Regions:
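Conserved His + Asp/Glu catalytic blocks
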Residues: 86, 99-203
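Short metal-coordination and nucleic-acid-contact micro-motifs, chiefly zinc-binding Cys/His arrays
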Residues: 54-60
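Core catalytic machinery and nucleic-acid-binding channels of phosphodiester-processing enzymes
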Residues: 51, 68, 86
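Divalent metal-coordination and catalytic microenvironments
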Residues: 55, 94, 151
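Short, cysteine/histidine-rich loop/knuckle motifs that typically chelate Zn2+
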Residues: 62-66
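N-terminal alpha-helical interaction blocks
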Residues: 1-51
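Short microdomains enriched in Cys/His and/or Lys/Arg
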Residues: 71-104
Length: 203
């Protein structure tokens, strides 16, 4: 329950931002989101599983996004195992970010992110390396500065030879260069990229 309580508190912050962007009916759903939770448990009551809840299903709601992320993580894990075994691929985990923005600029920044990633993914160097990818947008809030940081987490499938073939390997410096070029923002100081281990934990 503590996890849900923490996310519900974040939902209350989210309400202030989203109210002017959605219809009244949708806002009421967001405001009421996960105020009712029904669990099933074993005889000891130690293991509990959520059975039913009144979710708003808004993609940016902290509670709904968290629950969807947990479900997606399981699906991704199974997919990765299958692709590694059947397609002989490996995976890298890429995080792309830009400087924080204020609430009023967040919507435009998300549109800019999508357009920037589209530009980067259309580059020949990207297409030569990437055999498939799953992309997720995450938005974090800095309470002290009252601003937001949207960023992409990208799971990328590559050939096993990617890590040893100098013709195709893209190092961290090159990924940064590609992202700066795509966003047209030279103020970006870092991107994060790492290989996914066989046991599905990141290095």
């Amino acid at each position: 329950m503590d996890k849900y309580t923490n996310k519900k508190l974040r939902n209350q912050v989210f309400q202030k931002f989203i109210e002017r962007h959605v219809k009244k009916e949708q806002f009421y759903l967001i405001e009421d989101c996960n105020t009712f939770l029904s669990f099933v448990a074993d005889k000891t009551l130690e293991k509990q599983k959520l059975y039913k809840a009144n979710s708003c299903r808004n993609r940016f709601c902290p509670v709904c996004a968290w629950r969807k992320a947990r479900k997606d993580a399981l699906g991704l894990s199974l997919m990765m195992q299958y692709i590694k075994q059947e397609e002989s691929k490996e995976f890298i985990f890429l995080t792309l970010t830009t400087p924080n923005v204020k609430a009023e600029a967040l919507e435009d920044e998300i549109k800019h992110y999508n357009a920037s990633f589209r530009r980067m993914s259309n580059r020949k160097i990207f297409k030569d390396v990437v055999k498939g990818y799953v992309r997720k947008l995450e938005i974090t809030y800095n309470k002290k500065r009252d601003d937001y940081n949207p960023h992409f987490h990208v799971l990328i499938a590559v050939n096993k030879s990617y890590f040893t073939d100098k013709r195709y390997y893209i190092n961290q410096k090159k990924w940064l260069e590609l992202w700066r070029s795509a966003t047209k923002d030279e103020s970006i100081t870092q991107v994060h990229v790492q290989k996914i281990k066989q046991n599905n934990n990141k290095e």
